[in-house]
Amino acid sequence: MTTGRNNRVMMEGVGARVIRGPDWKWGKQDGGEGHVGTVRSFESPEEVVVVWDNGTAANYRCSGAYDVRILDSAPTGIKHDGTMCDTCRQQPIIGIRWKCAECTNYDLCTTCYHGDKHHLRHRFYRITTPGSERVLLESRRKSKKITARGIFAGGRVVRGVDWQWEDQDGGNGRRGKVTEIQDWSAASPHSAAYVLWDNGAKNLYRVGFEGMSDLKCVQDAKGGTFYRDHCPVLGEQNGNRNPGGLQIGDLVNIDLDLEIVQSLQHGHGGWTDGMFETLTTTGTVCGIDEDHDIVVQYPSGNRWTFNPAVLTKANVVRSGEVAAGAEGGSSQFMVGDLVQICYDIDRIKLLQRGHGEWAEAMLPTLGKVGRVQQIYSDSDLKVEVCGTSWTYNPAAVTKVAPAGSAVTNASGERLSQLLKKLFETQESGDINEELVKAAANGDLAKVEDILKRPDVDVNGQCAGHTAMQAASQNGHVDVLKLLLKHSVDLEAEDKDGDRAVHHASFGDEGSVIEVLHRGGADLNARNKRRQTPLHIAVNKGHLQVVKTLLDFGCHPSLQDSEGDTPLHDAISKKRDDMLSVLLEAGADVTITNNNGFNALHHAALRGNPSAMRVLLSKLPRPWIVDEKKDDGYTALHLAALNNHVEVAELLVHQGNANLDVQNVNQQTALHLAVERQHTQIVRLLVRAEAKLDVQDKDGDTPLHEALRHHTLSQLRQLQDMQDVSKVEPWEPSKNTLIMGLGTQGAEKKSAASIACFLAANGADLTIRNKKGQSPLDLCPDPSLCKALAKCHKEKTSGQVGSRSPSLNSNNETLEECMVCSDMKRDTLFGPCGHIATCSLCSPRVKKCLICKEQVQSRTKIEECVVCSDKKAAVLFQPCGHMCACENCASLMKKCVQCRAVVERRTPFVLCCGGKGMEDATDDEDLTGGSNSMAGGSQDLLQPNNLALSWSSGNIPALQRDKDNTNVNADVQKLQQQLQDIKEQTMCPVCLDRLKNMIFMCGHGTCQLCGDRMSECPICRKAIERRILLY
């Protein structure tokens, strides 16, 4: 058994932020002096696992030698109730408490202590945990300070060992910047870091909470300074000790003269005549008060308080019980020694305080003989006795002389009896352990033999598990059936609350679950985490067990302690097969977890398109797709916010999600996509005809958001285009920024391109927010304002939809030079194949204005080399030459310039950024290819293919059809909701009267039908009791 002391250290240490300790000998594993890490777990009382901020994880010593110190234990949640930091007013103090030794009732938290608050000359007590020994420290003025380095504000990070947040960071290896150290929860301060990723996403991640490390530092930052030698050593125990080394349970004598004792007692409890008994009697330390005075209890039952200087620690081993021939052996224990446990229960309870503590389960060991397994650094003994291991105060045991010692006949007989008693105890004391082990190994014969013994407990435990649980997890059906014949408790729980059916689920034993079900086991039983066997089966990926549980009627939608149903877990584990099975069994998609996410929300948040596809295909009610969280977010909001494009497409096209639902801030999914500059989501929503002029709580439309972002990022955009912007402000007709929306690279996102796209699709430029600002008021760039106005005008006048893709198009936009606007485009850029400028402006352009690719070659477009009548107007691929007009190019199978086979012909208008009839990449604009960007960017101005055939006269008719469709959908939704209400409230038998009688199985009918029935019409269980509803 692990000692109470070690259990406490291990429990309280997980999550602590640590630095290298006094016995460090591991080089720069931690990154160097002052670098910080997190306690992840304890391998044993002697070893701790630390994950350093640089990503290194290793075991370190925390007993005997101490490799780490505790810098901040606040993330562990240790709190000192009734205290308050007198500087920052934190109440209660969480982490280490620093109490001024020179001021009355003045405390500091760790941050304020190392931050040099209060007088630096004053000495402080360090109190690591509530009730622990306070340690007096030197004044900070004389102490050395070191700078902490690691995951702090300003540091650069990537995902760490405990990362479980999908691709929020943009993908494995992507970097982000820590902006602030925050609290993951109110009970765990300084346990998280807020990170702004390079892809623009930002969120909070665990750095210490429950020992988790979501991040790894690639460029550390400074986290302030600290007093290294004032930080406690992890694992070093000084609780319940005084400066003299006395502990609770120690035996003490008084060896001083009466006059000296009386003098030392002044101010330490004084002296009375009743204390004379203490001069000749050995007492036991039973307490240490706040002034470090020692409370001693004597055999008479009296307790006296002493100055520690008065007392002398007595010898803990009573050598009188061991023969004199065992010289030297009686004063010291060794591993392997035989020892007898004290008989006196009252005495051993007192002695065990601070030495592993007393447990009622230790009662059978009194007076028994055991063997020393381990000796701890504080001299406590780990003794194996009666088939179990416990930690004892050395004063609570008596050493049995070794077999070879010179003993008297009497003592030799006594030793022989004790050894015989030892072996008898091992045989009888291990019977439950033997039963559990035999059941775990599937040894049917041995289990049967053990069960015949009268002293066996069929529900007895070994290592916290019963024989039934062991057999269930290992799939031993024959053993299970035998145990069931002996009235085993099917619902017995282990320390985690798991029952036999939980163990069967964990071990992937479907046949065991069948046996347990027939035996009457509760398949919906929950453990301490509120998990059912179905939760465990889903999390472990045991599909057959999931099917078995559902076949036997296991409830498919029970929630665990975090509110997650098996559906949530299946989505998290990306198990679409289990998802389908659960939905077919009637799992409720609408149940929300503790964070307010139902299954659809969860799939959208996780960015799991396959799960979303399954959910949408099996939705019992179509409107569930628009269910809101408590903050008003729908699944579409979450997909738009996190840039999960595939999920959003499924919600829009397969789920027919309402595009204009508003959250509590009155934001639509389009607001969120524009705010995060997720161009693909913006395009998807606009093409699906989302309303462009919905206002949020501040009155802002998506266009307001886009232009606000443009203003903030304008300097960076100008820097990207510095080679062009020096010539002349760009004209709206050039569509330069509109082309940028077709580019999917993270560096190419442009709020201005989104703004132009919204305007080109009819966004209102005059609508004002609550501050009285129109979108144009938020745009200080007159050129962009002009572009927006022209895009909007083209939309309203029908020009957007009527652009001809013909090579003979008179569209001046595609013919004008994008730099000077005076000359026509006549220069082919290589290698991208775009035509953007005239020959005079082309030398100034370093990057293609359409795709932003580096320009490596410039070729002026000449006459057709075949007919010499027209200009060359078709780009041959893959050679990249433009040497023939449209008519001549259609006849060629090889390029006349290089004789390469022509695999593809790209029209002039497509090279200019327009849309051509021969563009084979019309649906590939999402992939980000150069041609697809050029072809798709013009398509951005067309919400859907109907735009080509619309005229100004028939738009209202189409709008009316759309409105009628929406009304019909709303009516259908209301009708179905009404039908659901009827099904829930009407009697399922007669279908005429309201349901007002409920049976014990949970089903119900009307009273008239219920009174005539003996079994439930739904589940066919016998009706034991009827309850009327009022």
Swiss-Prot record:
Positions of RING-type zinc fingers: 817-852, 864-899, 987-1020
Record pathway: Protein modification; protein ubiquitination
Start and stop residues of the ANK repeats: 430-460, 463-492, 496-525, 529-558, 562-591, 595-627, 631-661, 665-694, 698-727
Domain (MIB/HERC2): residue spans on this chain: 6-74, 143-221
Chain positions recorded as Zn(2+) 2 binding sites: 100, 103, 118, 122
Coiled coil: 957-986
GO molecular-function terms, A-Z: identical protein binding; ubiquitin protein ligase activity; ubiquitin-protein transferase activity; zinc ion binding
Reactions the enzyme catalyzes: S-ubiquitinyl-[E2 ubiquitin-conjugating enzyme]-L-cysteine + [acceptor protein]-L-lysine = [E2 ubiquitin-conjugating enzyme]-L-cysteine + N(6)-ubiquitinyl-[acceptor protein]-L-lysine
Assigned EC number: 2.3.2.27
Entry text on domains: The N-terminal domain (1-440) mediates the interaction with Delta receptors. The ANK repeats are involved in Delta receptor internalization.
Protein name: E3 ubiquitin-protein ligase mib1
Organism of provenance: Danio rerio (Zebrafish)
Taxonomic lineage of the native organism: Eukaryota, Metazoa, Chordata, Craniata, Vertebrata
Gene: mib1
